[in-house]
């Protein structure tokens, strides 16, 4: 079912006026301008975004934490190594350091618009990007990279890395 420009515009307005349901609750400063440029185009609206982040979390924690883990540290900005080290308590259990790269989810008016933006994403190095066609003509583009990193820091309370900073 093909959507009219008026229907897309209405849905875009609803999306932009909706509550930000992300854990952080707002768009990351590092990509505010990019999100603004995308949303200023009639054919696109961002539905979620993250500029990238580092996370230190503990696995195997009692229920009640997201996906069975407790977040001990998170930042969407550059981090001083000492700041991260200070948040490490190996007694917590199984600690994991994780880097997640930028991700954007963009609703597109047509498949042709999505293909154009998808080509731009691929040429910019976001090789894990893709287009999803949903029910009722909904076209979504995910701009993603495969440059993530996940490193165990401690296991069963035993530190697996050194506290030394070079």
Q: Which residue ranges define each predicted feature?
A:
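Helix-rich interaction surfaces within compact, conserved domain-sized segments
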Residues: 116, 120-166
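Compact, Lys/Arg-rich rRNA/RNP-binding cores from ribosome-related proteins
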Residues: 100, 114
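Short cationic amphipathic helices and targeting signals
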Residues: 102-108
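Duplex nucleic acid-engaging cores and interfaces of nucleic-acid transaction enzymes
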Residues: 95-98
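N-terminal, charge-rich interaction modules
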Residues: 1-92
